[in-house]
């Protein structure tokens, strides 16, 4: 066989679709079957009709809402963080064009088209789409709703720390350090002098003194890895019930500088509203617990004298891990004391311990799928509302993946080759195990059959 060489080939001017050998992806085919069975496109088109022109003025038609929301779901399934990345990925594979409902000879929507479609569609509409996917899960008996776990995580904003400016004077951080150096007697400070001066300062990056002109909603925050960035905070409410499978009941994007106790009530209210919408829908009302959102499982950051009584007023029983605070005084705070002691009794019981273990398992898994493998730990959108729109559809994609895992054993399209590799490894291990058994049998010699045994050792033969 002669050596083949790579040559510069002129592409053909015309090619038929039959020659492209287009193949769909089985995972995305399954997702489309579920969405089509519940009339997803009809729902979102009716929901978004008010944000589009009626067509009387002519012009190019806008991007279909069903395609727009599917593009954002592709961001979750493929682990893509930016709209430019979604644009590139959808145009790279014909299988994704089929998932979006586009002909293979037409380009997928570009990043500017996705951005232009996102801006007029308000946040409440994105929340309605998230609620629709939650109803799909409830229709498949994957939502219980009685017990919810709440946790938060930080998302790095699309703004650099070097761009922050003073709230009072508007000067940048470098200019601020140079002014401090001159006030301390250094006329021409070097970079080493500025770094030394910066290390000696205390409270050098306070949200009360500094802001980002690129992202006013982003706040200076210490991330989980110990670094400091401008960030937003995402808070999840996840189904932890006995019959639940860890579906996201609500998600909100909050001020990163606000403590967990300040944002908990809003997330609980959002989860309650979503579950109330399920209870009001006669198609799924019998598949959701009648005592929806009656228990909240929380971490140590949510335990406070104000939070626990607030939850009791909302008829929500708390299972909050209690931090070590030593001996406490409860002068004039009888309600807070009663709520704290009741929470302590529940946490120390068997059910409380089981729920806290379930919280550590399902909540951590949710954050990992949405923000680590889902590619949303670093944001490329500016403005808290735009971030919340993307996070809501991202969480809806997580719930769709949960349904796929329960029905087909695959949460994401990348799970398909992983499952095939696991099956091949299992078959290989079984073959090796059988080979070892055969080799051991050959080493010990043939096993005597009952006819080959002496008469006295063979009870099956009659005595002589």
Model-assigned labels for residue ranges:
Residues 11-13, 97, 138, 350-351:
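Short hydrophobic/aromatic segments of transmembrane alpha-helices and their interfaces
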Residues 24-73, 78:
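Basic, short loop/linker segments at the boundary and entry of helix-turn-helix/winged-helix-like folds
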Residues 1-32:
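Hydrophobic alpha-helical membrane-insertion signals
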Residues 58-60, 99-105:
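Catalytic micro-motifs at enzyme active sites that drive phosphoryl/nucleotidyl and oxygen chemistry
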Residues 79-91, 102-464:
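Anion-binding and metal-coordination hotspots
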Residues 39, 76-79, 94-98, 400:
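Short alpha-helix boundary/capping elements
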Residues 65-76, 88, 92-94, 234-235:
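Contiguous, well-ordered alpha-helical segments that form the cores/surfaces of helical PPI scaffolds
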Residues 50, 92-96, 155:
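A short structural micro-motif
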């Amino acid at each position: 066989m002669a050596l083949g060489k790579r040559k510069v080939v002129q592409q053909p001017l015309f090619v038929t679709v039959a020659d492209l050998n287009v193949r769909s992806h089985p995972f995305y085919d399954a997702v489309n079957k579920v969405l089509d069975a519940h009339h997803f496109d009809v729902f979102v088109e009716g929901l978004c009709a008010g944000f589009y022109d009626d067509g009387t003025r002519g012009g190019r038609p806008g991007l279909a809402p069903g395609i727009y929301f599917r593009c954002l779901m592709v961001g979750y399934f493929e682990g893509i963080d930016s709209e430019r990345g979604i644009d590139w990925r959808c145009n790279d594979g014909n299988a994704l064009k089929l998932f979006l409902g586009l002909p293979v000879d037409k380009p997928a929507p570009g990043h500017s088209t996705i951005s232009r479609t996102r801006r007029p569609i308000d946040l409440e509409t994105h929340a309605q789409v998230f609620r629709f996917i939650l109803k799909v899960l409830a229709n498949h008996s994957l939502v219980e709703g009685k017990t919810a776990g709440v946790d938060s995580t930080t998302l790095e904003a699309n703004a650099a720390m070097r761009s922050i400016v003073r709230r009072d004077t508007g000067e940048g951080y470098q200019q601020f350090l140079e002014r401090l150096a001159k006030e301390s007697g250094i006329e021409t400070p070097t970079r080493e002098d500025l770094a030394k001066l910066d290390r000696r300062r205390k409270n050098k990056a306070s949200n009360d003194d500094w802001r980002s002109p690129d992202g006013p909603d982003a706040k200076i925050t210490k991330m989980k890895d110990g670094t400091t960035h401008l960030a937003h905070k995402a808070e999840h409410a996840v189904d932890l019930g006995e019959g639940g499978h860890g579906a996201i009941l609500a998600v909100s994007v909050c001020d990163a500088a606000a403590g967990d106790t300040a944002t908990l009530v809003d997330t609980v209210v959002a989860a309650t509203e979503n579950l109330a919408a399920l209870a009001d829908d006669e198609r799924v009302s019998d598949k959701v617990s009648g005592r929806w959102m009656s228990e909240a499982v929380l971490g140590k950051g949510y335990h406070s004298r104000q939070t626990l009584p607030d939850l009791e007023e909302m008829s929500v029983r708390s299972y909050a891990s209690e931090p070590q605070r030593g001996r406490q005084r409860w002068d004039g705070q009888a309600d807070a004391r009663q709520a704290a002691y009741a929470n302590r009794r529940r946490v120390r019981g068997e059910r409380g311990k089981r729920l806290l273990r379930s919280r550590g398992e399902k909540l951590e898994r949710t954050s990992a799928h949405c923000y680590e493998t889902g590619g949303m730990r670093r944001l490329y959108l500016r403005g808290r509302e735009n971030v919340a729109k993307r996070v809501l559809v991202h969480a809806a994609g997580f719930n769709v993946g949960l349904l796929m895992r329960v029905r087909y054993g695959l949460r994401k399209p990348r799970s398909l080759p992983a499952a095939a590799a696991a099956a091949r490894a299992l078959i290989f291990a079984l073959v090796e195990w059988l080979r070892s058994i055969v080799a051991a049998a050959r080493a010990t010699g043939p096993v005597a059959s009952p006819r080959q045994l002496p008469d006295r050792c063979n009870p099956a033969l009659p005595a002589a």
